[in-house]
């Protein structure tokens, strides 16, 4: 059962060939088997998963409508609010925080989302390796000496190891796509506003987006079908009709225009074999009928520094709410200002403190226009670059990451080296366009992801291209370790 895709498992549960309870029990057993090696979860919810699975089975017995995504156990990144289940954001400052409401993305799963646990993550989603968690690092199921990527590394490890059939992650500057690449999965960042952010604890509000992490593209399409749509509780939620993401998935890429992004394929630090796998994927799409050419995003090289000004600036504002007064950790002290200082000093980790300071500096009087204002101008230029590119191409292609998964501890003390991992991912985040990472091949026995990017709300086309790329790679999901 653990080898099935989420789509296949849903088919079998709905056909009453297996029960949701059996699926939940299998996931729980797998968590118990490998969690000691991986540390995929901050909070396990095995009993809750069994209770909810039993209710799904009862609804099926009564002949009630049960949608495919309601049948499949899921791992949930610990940045999404779950009513009555602690939600830590990987931080000590929220160690005992239990939300009183559920994130809208989880409400999409009906009354009984079969959640196997809250997945580990970099603290407040700030990181590229899941080493910044206050609850210990997560290890990559492909090689336990390596990172799974971040910040959604726990979600990626859980899916790769079969601790759940799929997972919800969040992507601010690559945090779904990069761990998907490192763990041999499909990771989709939808168009900004396609999925409600209500109940998502904010990192950078103009960038954060919830996305699927799955075993294959068909599962990603099914999970997006579940969570996409307008939500009046989220002012940034787009009132754009949700299409059927599965209907055209197998149509192929005949006539599709695919542009290879020169600046990202040739970016500094991109390993030769990673570059070759991306170009090989482009050739495979061309052989399948796509029209492939080269395209330029002239300002893509400025995306990384712009991102690391804009995102910390939003962090500085968003994390001001953690003061020990309303919720979360409170460290006693003489006087309210000393209590603020001690609470934040003890509650936040080093990377979070670093980004708060960077953001506060960028927003300070005398520096706002020189840093934040200029970064926003770069963001506008990148949006214009994509607009020009999509006038001639339907899908753009690049590596997802410059390298394969690196070793635990290798970059954790070198912030600039860690940030450089995001060089291929941040342009799509700054523009708010959809982007997906699909397995393209192996380098040194480790998975390499290829990134495809589409125009706003073009997820059906993007998923169709990703499905063709996935099939061309010849790779098939296998449980690790």
UniProtKB/Swiss-Prot annotation:
Molecular function via GO: ATP binding; glutaminyl-tRNA synthase (glutamine-hydrolyzing) activity
UniProt cross-references to Pfam families, sorted A to Z: Amidase
Keyword terms: ATP-binding, Ligase, Nucleotide-binding, Protein biosynthesis
PROSITE patterns documented for this protein: AMIDASES (PS00571)
Active site positions, chain numbering: 77 (charge relay system), 151 (charge relay system), 175 (acyl-ester intermediate)
GO biological-process terms attached to the record: translation
GO cellular component assignments: glutamyl-tRNA(Gln) amidotransferase complex
Chemical reaction(s) catalysed: L-glutamyl-tRNA(Gln) + L-glutamine + ATP + H2O = L-glutaminyl-tRNA(Gln) + L-glutamate + ADP + phosphate + H(+)
Protein family per UniProt: Belongs to the amidase family. GatA subfamily.
NCBIfam families: gatA
Complexes and interactors: Heterotrimer of A, B and C subunits.
Name this protein carries in UniProt: Glutamyl-tRNA(Gln) amidotransferase subunit A
């Amino acid at each position: 059962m653990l080898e099935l895709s989420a789509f296949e498992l849903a088919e079998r549960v709905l056909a009453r060939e297996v029960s949701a309870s059996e699926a939940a029990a299998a996931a729980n057993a797998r968590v118990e088997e490998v969690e000691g090696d991986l540390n995929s979860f901050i909070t396990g919810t095995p009993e809750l998963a069994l209770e909810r699975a039993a209710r799904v089975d009862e609804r099926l017995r009564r002949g009630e409508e049960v949608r495919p995504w309601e049948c499949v156990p899921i791992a949930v990144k610990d940045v999404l609010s779950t009513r009555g289940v602690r939600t830590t954001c990987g931080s000590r400052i929220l160690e005992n925080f239990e939300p009183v409401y559920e994130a809208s993305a989880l409400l999409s799963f009906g009354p009984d989302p079969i959640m196997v646990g809250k997945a580990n993550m970099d603290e407040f989603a700030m990181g590229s390796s899941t080493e910044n968690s206050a609850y210990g690092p997560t290890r990559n199921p492909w090689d336990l000496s390596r990172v799974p990527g971040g910040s959604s590394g726990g979600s990626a490890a859980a899916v790769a190891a079969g601790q759940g059939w799929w997972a919800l992650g969040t992507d601010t500057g690559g945090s779904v796509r990069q761990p998907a690449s490192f763990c041999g999965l499909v990771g989709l960042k939808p168009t900004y506003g396609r999925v409600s952010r209500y109940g998502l604890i904010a990192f950078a509000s103009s960038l954060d987006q919830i996305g699927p992490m799955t075993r294959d593209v068909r599962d990603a399409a099914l999970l997006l079908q579940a969570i996409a749509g307008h939500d009046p509780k989220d002012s940034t939620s787009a009132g754009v009709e949700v299409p059927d993401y599965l209907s055209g998935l197998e149509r192929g890429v005949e006539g599709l225009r695919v542009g290879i992004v020169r600046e990202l394929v040739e970016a500094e630090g991109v390993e030769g074999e990673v570059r070759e796998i991306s170009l090989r994927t482009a050739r495979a799409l061309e052989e399948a009928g796509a029209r492939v050419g080269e395209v330029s995003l002239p300002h893509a090289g400025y995306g990384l520094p712009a991102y690391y000004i804009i995102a910390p600036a939003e962090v500085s504002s968003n994390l001001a709410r953690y003061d020990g007064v309303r919720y979360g950790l409170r460290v006693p002290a003489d006087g309210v200002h000393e209590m603020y200082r001690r609470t934040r000093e003890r509650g936040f980790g080093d990377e979070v403190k670093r980004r708060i300071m960077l953001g506060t500096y960028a927003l300070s009087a005398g520096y706002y226009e020189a840093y934040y204002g200029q970064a926003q101008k770069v963001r506008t230029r990148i949006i214009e670059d994509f607009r020009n590119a999509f006038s001639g191409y339907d899908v753009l292609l690049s590596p997802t990451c410059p390298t394969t998964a690196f070793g635990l501890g290798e970059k954790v003390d070198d912030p600039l080296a860690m940030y450089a991992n995001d060089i291929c991912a941040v342009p799509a985040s700054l523009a708010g366009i959809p982007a997906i990472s699909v397995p393209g091949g192996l380098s040194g026995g480790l998975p390499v992801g290829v990134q495809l990017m589409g125009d706003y709300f073009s997820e059906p086309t993007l998923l169709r291209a990703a499905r063709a790329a996935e099939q061309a790679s010849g790779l098939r999901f296998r449980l690790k370790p």
